[in-house]
Amino acid sequence: AASDVYKRQELTVRGTTFRHPKGVLHLTQFTQVALAVVAYAQTERLRAENTLAPTSYFAGHSLGEYTALASLANIFDLEGVIDIVYSRGSAMGSLVPRDEKGNSEYAMAALRPNMAGIDADNVDAWVAEVAETTGEFLEIVNYNIRGQQYSVAGTKKGLKALVDKANAIAPRAAVMVPGIDVPFHSRVLREGVPAFAEKLDELLPQELDLDALVGRYIPNLVARPFELTQDFVDAVAPLAPSGKLDGLRVEDLSEHALARLLLIELLSWQFASPVRWIETQELLFGKVEQIIEVGLASSPTLTNLAERSLAVAGIPEGTIRVLNVERDQEQVMLADVSEAPAPDPVAEPVAEEAPQADEAPAEAAP
């Protein structure tokens, strides 16, 4: 039965045994592949319906960055997406120690600072104080809604202290996120960056579609449009401390070689660095009229984040249209657009005397 497969706690594939107390399908490398394939298929449908704007901005939240690059910048084909996402998930999972039953010491919590009276500018300091007081690892890994929603990875002990402290101020100011036992996007995973960078180097084509990347792609790591400029290289370098960008001058490499190096650095350090979605959204809000989320209608996460963030920013409702590709497919596919009615018959136009030279039409007036 399907439920038996879903709950299966141990699976051996090609000599490797996978274990998870809630079922192996909860393991990162399997859940992320499933999500990536769905997103890839949804984007390909948009392409088939000719609804992808060739100059639109694109960004992906965490895992979504890979499918966005694959579908909108032609970086990977479907097989490549599956390979890289599986490798990414495996790298994350392998860096987390587990007991004989497959349990890890890590978890994740959602923090709502506004409910606990924590100012948006003080959220990082507040979390750091809890970590210092308890001696436990805690790190904000998803910056989702300014002042209202942040994901915090950490040890179970550290997160319990954080949740207890926040909820002592206001009930449900912090809640544990079920089903997560890997500290995604945290410094705990930095040990796996070099191996993942090698995998990216293996799978990335030597020449990239630069028109699809430059000025359009907004990486999680820096939350600003991708560029082949010295300023962009200098902005990425301290966030991707492999040393590969240190002292690099853009004129030393061809555009394709530079783009490829930057992409490897951006993506390999992405899984061990926070997702800067607040800044990404605020950038988009100042540049676009419509946002389309590629994702499931049953869980329109980014649609909800965008709508709430627009309200926080004080942007009037309706100024920017926010759609989910599955939930709002008629609007996304333009299927809700009615044909224009046939024009009423009109009389033949009557020629009028042209204006004299000293009677220029208003459009030509200075």
Model-predicted regions and their roles:
Residues G60, G64:
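Gly/Ala-rich beta-loop-alpha elbow adjacent to hydrolase catalytic centers
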Residues S3-T55, R187, E198-P349:
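Acyltransferase/transacylase module recognition
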Residues E352-P366:
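Long, low-complexity, intrinsically disordered segments
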Residues E65, K156-K157, V182-H185, L296-L302:
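Gly/Ser/Thr-rich loops at beta-strand to alpha-helix junctions
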Residues S71-L245, E255:
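Alpha/beta catalytic cores of group-transfer enzymes, especially the acyltransferase/condensing modules
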Residues A1-A2, Y6, E363-A365:
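Short, intrinsically disordered, charge-balanced linker/junction segments flanking boundaries
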Residues Q32-Y40, E65, S104, M108:
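Short alpha-helical patches at coil-to-helix transitions and adjacent helical residues
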